[in-house]
């Protein structure tokens, strides 16, 4: 169907949860098509090759809301990069380079200092600004993700509405990146951050 000029719509019957898909775009009548991933996808396969139908509300349930915050001038904001803060070989974090690495409590460096979430909380931080956590293109999510291997801060977005797969424990599972990012957010909220 074409409800408005330049807008196309398709409805499928049945439960499509978990179905992978792409669009084929044809710009001129009789022209060849260009395959594209849905720019509004909420889940994708590894390396963002295909969109995946997922009911995020059903998957995650209701989000935990933080209590209202006082004056903005009281905010203590800490900017962090998921991989940088969790990948180090001496930080005591189990899920290195992953969203889940920022959910771990009781982590310490080899020298005995707080690390990860405990370290951030000990600073009195009220807010964190995460460097890009959306799906970006320059890291092969199925490649070598160990310390010293592929590295990028993520300023090459591909799918703005999808968490980055290299930060998930299983980048081939479209749901794990969503669920684990939510766990990261919940862990910070549990600390009042």
Language model region names:
Residues 120-149:
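Carboxylate/His-rich catalytic cores and anion/metal-binding grooves
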Residues 63-70, 114-126, 185:
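Short amphipathic alpha-helices and their capping/turn segments at secondary-structure boundaries
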Residues 27-29, 134, 185:
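Surface-exposed loop/turn motifs at beta-strand-loop junctions within extracellular Ig-like
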Residues 23, 80, 120, 130, ...:
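Conserved, mostly hydrophobic/aromatic
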Residues 102-120:
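Short, acidic/polar
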Residues 74-75, 123-128, 189-193:
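Loop/turn elements at helix/coil->beta-strand transitions in domains of secreted/extracellular proteins
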Residues 3-104:
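The feature marks proteins involved in alpha-glucan
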Residues 91-107, 140-190:
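Aromatic- and acidic-residue-enriched carbohydrate-binding clefts of CAZyme catalytic domains
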